[in-house]
Amino acid sequence: MTQSKTNLPRRRLLTQTLGLSVIAATAGRSAFAQDKPTIKIGFVDGWADSVATTNLAANIIKEKLGYPVELVPLAAGIMWQGVARGDIDCTLSAWLPVTHEAYLATYKDKVQILGANYPGAKIGLIVPEYVKPTSLDNLNASKADFDNRIVGIDAGAGVMKKTEEAIKTYGLEMRLQPSSGPAMAAELDRAIRAKKSIAVTGWIPHWMFAKYKLRFLADPKNVYGAEEHVDSVVNPGLKAKAPAVYAFLSKLSWKPEEIGAVMLSVENGAKPAAAADKWMADNPARVQGWLS
């Protein structure tokens, strides 16, 4: 059907008006963001907790505080270095006091620790519930069941260094196999499906504990240290650069079930930013509490 010629000017005017409105709204948002500096957040891609917390914070900083945000995936050591040098503004992925103790010793005079965004963290060797060993000091007796290996993550990571120390301290006749966070999780999944023995370097918080029945091997010699916390660490210049962001990060701290919901959503296929947005929508009072 052909359009009535008398309707064309009206439709053209409506289209032009809507177009101008969209342009004006977009320009307004762009101007809002351009008035403020970009906040660069370093994180460790492949660490489920790092991805979850970083995306939540980024969404809040963008949507509630109006700052543009750039997420920068880095290895842990480079991440700390970047905050110290000011190449990035902050990280929400500092495991203290044990896992990242070497980085803190190196950069403590050039960074500022705002406090824990997740208390109750822990690292160590993790096994499925069905395996026989219960402790690092009896792991050697079953080493053949584990193919004489421990599946690790990125070489140089804090938990990897502690595992190398554990191998020496407990006299473990097993090799530490570096890989990555996702590769380690994939190996764990395959082993559990086949009900094979496997030991992996791991930590809480992690979605693996929600998906599988796992436990830490006891560490009677305390190589891995006691309970840890995941801290927000910033470049000292952030307070002057973005005081609202600094204030928000100083208050940000969430609970195991909260971060667990976002991590599981991502593991089940959601985009990290979308999972964080959903959590924000479901928990407006918690978000407002960090901003007030």
Regions found by a protein language model. Name each.
Residues A57-G66, A141-L176:
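Ligand-binding cleft/hinge of the Venus flytrap
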